[in-house]
Amino acid sequence: MFSKLFNLFRPSSKEDKCGRAETPSVQIKTSVVMSSSSSSSVSNARKLLKEATQLKKSKEYDAACEKLREAYEASDANELMVKERLRLPMYLQLAGKNDEGWKALNELNVEYVDVFSQAEIANQMRVFLQKEKQFKKAIMFSIWAIAKEIERDVQNVEASIENTDRMAELRAEYDFLEDDDEKEIHGYTPNGNPITDYAYELFLSRLTEAKSIEGVHQRIEKDMKKAKLLELTQPLANDISAYFSQKSHYRLEEVRDIIDKHVNVV
């Protein structure tokens, strides 16, 4: 069933399109929510989502899928986040349309290339495959989700540093009074400005944990157990941790090659 759709496990142009957050040939989207001018009124898209949920509960899966598509075409659909668009592939799976569901996941992966969306999509791919009992193949997306979460927090750290330096420049230019003298300092920018953003330390902590052997082991242990490969968890965690620590940019085919050293996922 997945023979045509799993070309992403081989080095090919299709794999690149599915696996990496590079500039796609379609309009780039993100999961950022746009504000609505009629915030006081009930969102038509969200109303349709609720109707889809009720149809799903009634096990009317085909009708639920169509209702989701209506929601995505609604005039206020730009308010929807990627997690709400990830419902369609899972509903298609429930309707027995597994190939169509996997295709929908890959299309979302091409359209929503921001690191926040990419992490969610990779994790949903893992869930989708596990529901298909494709446990070995799910391992790759379990690890790919970690990679995208690392990229997300690296971006968060960089944003915190940039914001700190920008505020310092504004204070110097307009002679603003310092308002953070009594705030706790969590680090310093390369320019020497004190970082008082409390989230900065959280992002650094998450990065350290995600890249560590223990952190990787903890994240993949359950998935390895489902694949009946629990004994390979430690050596795989060792290699993945080393990869995360040594590289600044991650590629799906490189992750796949590391996994192939321990597990045959084809």
Question: Could you describe each region identified by the protein language model?
Answer:
Residues 1-41:
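Long, contiguous interaction/recruitment modules in multidomain scaffold/adaptor proteins
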Residues 68, 74-76, 105, 111-116, ...:
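Alpha-helical junction/boundary sensor with strong preference for TPR arrays
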Residues 38-73:
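Alpha-helical segment of the N-proximal tetratricopeptide repeat
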